[in-house]
Design a protein with these regions (language model features):
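An acidic, glycine-rich, mixed-charge low-complexity segment common to nucleic-acid enzymes
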Residues: 1-66
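A short, basic-hydrophobic beta/loop patch
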Residues: 2-11, 83-123
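Short alpha-helix boundary/capping and kink motifs at helix termini
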Residues: 42-98, 110-111
């Protein structure tokens, strides 16, 4: 049995994560609203949630997690490199949570241990 690696995290998301989030958010939102959401994310306080809860709220099926290639992120975890916190957006009540940036990190963390507490910003 492979030993579980401890996941290390940066204190704040990296600057490039916000750009990636804005690019992704332009798919479900108009560009102007995507920019507004990213500005909100930049101002948001850090939060912490269990990996399994984030994935459940995002309605991500396990088969989808297994389909992605997140070996790069798993290698970073194994090497002890700190990961950037993820960026989350709550759409309308009842809609699935949007992982605006950090989906592959989320998959790698969940695969390592679904109970891991994940730092994130959420709006």
């Amino acid at each position: 049995m492979k030993k579980k690696s401890a996941v290390k995290w940066l204190d704040e998301p990296a600057g490039k994560d916000y750009s990636a989030a804005e690019s992704f958010l332009q798919l479900p939102y108009a560009p102007k609203l995507a920019r507004v959401r990213v500005k909100e994310l930049k101002r948001a306080q850090m939060s912490r949630y269990a990996a399994k809860d984030i994935l459940r709220a995002s309605a991500t099926p396990i088969s989808e997690i297994q389909a992605f290639d997140w070996t790069k992120q798993q290698d970073e975890i194994d090497k002890g490199a700190p990961l950037s916190p993820i960026l989350l957006v709550r759409p309308e009540p009842g809609d699935r949570l949007i992982v605006a940036d950090g989906f592959h990190r989320m998959c790698a963390v969940f695969a390592a241990d679904q109970e891991i507490i994940v730092p994130c910003k959420i709006v």
